[in-house]
Amino acid sequence: MSSLRLLISDSYDPWFNLAVEECIFRQMSPNQRVLFLWRNADTVVIGRAQNPWKECNTRRMEQDGVKLARRSSGGGAVFHDLGNTCFTFMAGKPGYDKTISTQIILNALASLGIQATASGRNDLVVINGEDERKVSGSAYKETKDRGFHHGTLLLNADLSRLADYLNPDPKKLQAKGITSVRSRVTNLVELLPGIDHGKIRTAIEQAFFAYYDEQVSAEVISPQSLPNLPGFTEQFAKQSSWEWNFGQAPAFSHVVDTRFIWGGIELHFDVLHGAIDRCQIFTDSLNPTPLEALAQRLQGAAYRPDAIDKICQHWIDDFPELQTELQQACHWLVEVLR
């Protein structure tokens, strides 16, 4: 039996790809060396310990249909589109060594005429003009008997969109968790016009085979053609769930405020595991009672616009004589929390 395994995903769904990655990692033989190549359509991928409300412009993402995906490894937030090629190297210990997988990527780039170097713990950089620019970022995960190294290569990504989704709204947000470090980046197409996913994928495959002096046939996987992956359905459900992608956020506080004709309101939220642990409302309204009632209702609710909207609608029903004013407040609150 070969010690190598090559998997290619035909899916652009980040939740599918991350679920496949996790299942293969858990079930692989400790003596195997696995290469998994994949791409995600418009997605912000965050590290295991990150806070999406701190890292991302969640409102803009929802408007533009950009998915949020939390990975099981550490590190920072990145934007993926089809101009990125994603790679995952997996191996059992003691064979797992992230310097080997880094070298395979460097060898693949060199075979295409691109001279890149490793920088720090996670990045690959190239010289573009007089500047050093990042073309690849990575993250890692290790267990007792195995490990994986995964990352992205910027081929022809829409770099203008990085600022759209990776700069959060200017909210009064105080949060714990790991903050992403923004780097100067460039696309490989700037160095090698005509490079595309097919070419870089082939180069990585050939560098993988050359390093281990062995070749295997690729296993192409998609939602219609899955390998035998026990537990995949459950893992996909987890990867695609609000509870994993948002609810795993570290504790944070969020303050929002606005002013209506009938008075100003300021809400202070303490959020723990994606739920409102504490809510305080301050107002100069002549009738603060409805807003005080809302603060009580929001306690324990999921910190998500649809859940808060549902609570607000029931709250409005309790004060029919103030329906217009409270609808204004509800609409504002749901929108500001997107």
Swiss-Prot record:
Domain BPL/LPL catalytic: 29-216
Residues involved in ATP binding: 71, 76-79, 134
Metabolic or biological pathway: Protein modification; protein lipoylation via exogenous pathway; protein N(6)-(lipoyl)lysine from lipoate: step 1/2; Protein modification; protein lipoylation via exogenous pathway; protein N(6)-(lipoyl)lysine from lipoate: step 2/2
Single biological process term from Gene Ontology: protein modification process
Residues at which (R)-lipoate binds: 134
Domain of life: Bacteria
Cellular component, GO annotation: cytoplasm; cytosol
This enzyme's EC code(s): 6.3.1.20
Enzyme class: ligase
Pfam families in the record: Lip_prot_lig_C, LplA-B_cat
Compartmental location: Cytoplasm
UniProt cross-references to Gene3D superfamilies, sorted A to Z: Bira Bifunctional Protein, Domain 2 (3.30.930.10), CO dehydrogenase flavoprotein, C-terminal domain (3.30.390.50)
GO molecular function annotations of the record: ATP binding; lipoate-protein ligase activity; lipoyltransferase activity
Catalytic activity: L-lysyl-[lipoyl-carrier protein] + (R)-lipoate + ATP = N(6)-[(R)-lipoyl]-L-lysyl-[lipoyl-carrier protein] + AMP + diphosphate + H(+)
Annotated keywords: ATP-binding, Cytoplasm, Ligase, Nucleotide-binding
Keyword Cytoplasm attached: yes
Entry-linked HAMAP family: LplA
UniProt record similarity statement: Belongs to the LplA family.
Additional detail: In the transfer reaction, the free carboxyl group of lipoic acid is attached via an amide linkage to the epsilon-amino group of a specific lysine residue of lipoyl domains of lipoate-dependent enzymes.
Biological role stated in the UniProt entry: Catalyzes both the ATP-dependent activation of exogenously supplied lipoate to lipoyl-AMP and the transfer of the activated lipoyl onto the lipoyl domains of lipoate-dependent enzymes.
Subunit structure: Monomer.
Protein name (Swiss-Prot/TrEMBL): Lipoate-protein ligase A
Organism per entry: Yersinia pestis
Annotated gene: lplA
